Amino acid sequence: MQNLTDSFVSLGHWPSAGSFGFNTDILATNPINLSVVLGVLIFFGKGVLSDLLDNRKQRILSTIRNSEELRGGAIEQLEKARARLRKVEMEADEFRVNGYSEIEREKLNLINSTYKNLERLENYKNETIQFEQQRAINQVRQRVFQQALQRALGTLNSCLNNELHLRTISANIGMFGTMKEITD
């Protein structure tokens, strides 16, 4: 106990800040207290340190297991992707081989349908031209007929006098009368 009291008393007397030196007094450095503290730390700290190391070990092992599982999943996905790639490459080769003949067939179909469309348009154009020509001819005929009729009426009007006009009307009435008797 005396030792303990002396320790507290000596704590109050610190060496001055200006001095520095080695303390060669073994009893003053208190190696027994230090060894006791180290012994207690080792005895009780071993369990805590062991638990910390075990926890760390478990986390590392679980991380490794997760990594292995992820690696396995990645390898599986890689194999699936390679299989899909092989399948797509085979389909692409098929399309390439079949595609050329399909393209040629489509090209010929397109050329044939374009030729038929052009032929149909040419026929439609010819029919339209014929229709327009016929309409123009009919308009010219109608115009010529109207002009001829107007000239004939003009000639008749200039040649007819009242007496000739009355005789023509009487002759026409007579013809209508005989026609009526024949039909009755």
Curated annotation (Swiss-Prot):
First-listed, main subcellular location of the protein, grouped into a coarse class? plastid
Point out the gene that encodes the protein.
Answer: atpF
| One Pfam family per UniProt | ATP-synt_B
Membrane topology note = Single-pass membrane protein
Matching entries from InterPro entries are given as: ATP_synth_b/b'su_bac/chlpt
Task: List UniProt keywords, sorted A-Z.
Answer: ATP synthesis, CF(0), Chloroplast, Hydrogen ion transport, Ion transport, Membrane, Plastid, Thylakoid, Transmembrane, Transmembrane helix, Transport
An additional note in the Swiss-Prot or TrEMBL entry is: In plastids the F-type ATPase is also known as CF(1)CF(0).
The UniProt GO MF terms for this protein read: proton-transporting ATP synthase activity, rotational mechanism
- Could you confirm whether the keyword Endoplasmic reticulum appears in this record? no
**Transmembrane regions:** 27-49
Q: Which domain of life is it from?
A: Eukaryota
The record's subunit annotation is: F-type ATPases have 2 components, F(1) - the catalytic core - and F(0) - the membrane proton channel. F(1) has five subunits: alpha(3), beta(3), gamma(1), delta(1), epsilon(1). F(0) has four main subunits: a(1), b(1), b'(1) and c(10-14). The alpha and beta chains form an alternating ring which encloses part of the gamma chain. F(1) is attached to F(0) by a central stalk formed by the gamma and epsilon chains, while a peripheral stalk is formed by the delta, b and b' chains.
Provide a GO CC annotation, any one: proton-transporting ATP synthase complex
The identity of this protein, by name, is ATP synthase subunit b, chloroplastic
Q: What is known about what this protein does?
A: F(1)F(0) ATP synthase produces ATP from ADP in the presence of a proton or sodium gradient. F-type ATPases consist of two structural domains, F(1) containing the extramembraneous catalytic core and F(0) containing the membrane proton channel, linked together by a central stalk and a peripheral stalk. During catalysis, ATP synthesis in the catalytic domain of F(1) is coupled via a rotary mechanism of the central stalk subunits to proton translocation. Component of the F(0) channel, it forms part of the peripheral stalk, linking F(1) to F(0).
Its lineage opens with: Eukaryota, Viridiplantae, Streptophyta, Embryophyta, Tracheophyta
In the record, the note on similarity to other proteins reads: Belongs to the ATPase B chain family.
As for subcellular location, the record says: Plastid, Chloroplast thylakoid membrane
